[in-house]
Amino acid sequence: MKRQAFSASRRGVRFNPWEPRNPLDELTYVARLGAFFVMVQKLQTDKKLALVGLSYIISPEFFQAMNLAIIGTGYVGLTTGTCFAEVGHNVICVDNDREKVEKLKNGYMPIYEPELEDMILSNVSAGKLSFTTDLAAAVHECEIIFIAVPTPPHADGSVDLSYIEAVSHEIADALRPEHGYRIIVDKSTVPVSTGSKVSEVIRRYAACDVKVDVVSNPEFLREGSAVKDLMNPDRIVIGANSQRAMDLMKRVYQPFSAPIVEVDLSSAELIKHAANSFLALKISYINAVAAVCEKAGADVELVAQGIGMDKRISRHFLNAGLGYGGSCFPKDVKGFINIADQLGTPMYLLKEVEQINARQIERFLDRIREKMWVLRNKRIAVWGIAFKQNTDDVRESVAVKLIRRLAEEGAIVTAYDPKAAETGARALEGVSVTICSDMYECVRDAEVLVVATEWRQFATANLVKVRELMHLPIIFDGRNILHGENAVHAGFEYHSVGRRSLYPDR
């Protein structure tokens, strides 16, 4: 009769077959226990993230580190690889940009993401995370290869899969039967059936007798909170058409305390597009409601609170403002529309979501014009360049689009962003705008202040000081982050989205 060992799990104590362990595993376990207490000290204010570490220590089976390759070091690849290393895996991040790889090796971060830099430096120092341009070597060493390369949109909204195809071909060239079984994982956001095409490329170009499965494992990280999202996910979606691949992928995610959604390859590919499109729909819906509120004299924030308390709806993403932007939502909505069109099932609903989003910035500009009449030579300060707070990413940023439009109409524009000054300068090259290094200097002599990104420091700004620096006391809050009564008390006219305008006593 086999001896039994017990272990803790979210379902309580359960018994597992006892098997002899390598004594070195005990050392690994003790090291992880020590690392956990260090993590708790670092993250005293983040109980959820600490609980991830706890579940990692008392997981149902003793953790075995795996060798993982991440192809691509953008937001998704770099953050995913770093978090895998943080929980104990051995990770090689691969990129064909030699300069970028050298910078990463030397501790230079190509992106801003809270907590990421410290995590990268500590795992590189510990030997758990490395960077290389040698894809073949990574494929030789690693059991599982994640593809996290860009999937930019074409003009018609379809997804450009040329990077996926090229990387798949390179992986196929590097695979050898003697390396053993390998799993290739699509981590990039891809259209349904991409996994099948990757499999075809592998079969076409790989050596005979190579054993490979292709898996879809979409990411759901949010820029600005990507580390927390990856360390404490709502769910982990794994799409595989083989049980062997599914079992190994579950081992990869063993340290994470989250439900695993086990589905087929095509369903996993569709989940990401469907999820992001639904979130974009919620944003456009509340912005459409905001337009009604402005005409009816209602407050969209109160309306959102009232409907968001319904558990079937939730308050998340019911934030009226300038609309959605960034590298995901615009691309994924267009991609899903294109996928549906190609399959002969047009998504008219999502086309309206796009139109509402495009109209939102026009509605906002109309209100500024209504107040200021002609914008030429008007001094307008813009707080925010990044597409959202806690990131330096300006891809598809509504703030960037707004700055461009104001400059095109002849306004004298100054702009400030705490993290996106450099990326913003590149995105706004050729645009007549002055990017400032201080949020208060940005508003000096301005006739209008526009809040375009929801940075916390804007919400807590000293409005009395801002009023003293500005030429005229007019605020257009495109993110509804300022307290209107405080703005009025400081002497401002306050205009927001989906709420009535407020004026100081005259």
Indicate where each model-derived feature is located:
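Polybasic, lysine-rich low-complexity intrinsically disordered segments
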Residues: 2, 22, 42-48
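Compositionally biased, low-complexity segments
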Residues: 3-5, 51, 55
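Intrinsically disordered, low-complexity segments enriched in serine/proline and basic residues
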Residues: 7-9, 21, 32
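Low-complexity, intrinsically disordered segments with a bias for serine/threonine
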Residues: 11-13, 41, 59, 63
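Structural/interface elements that position substrates and couple domains in central-metabolism enzymes
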Residues: 56-506
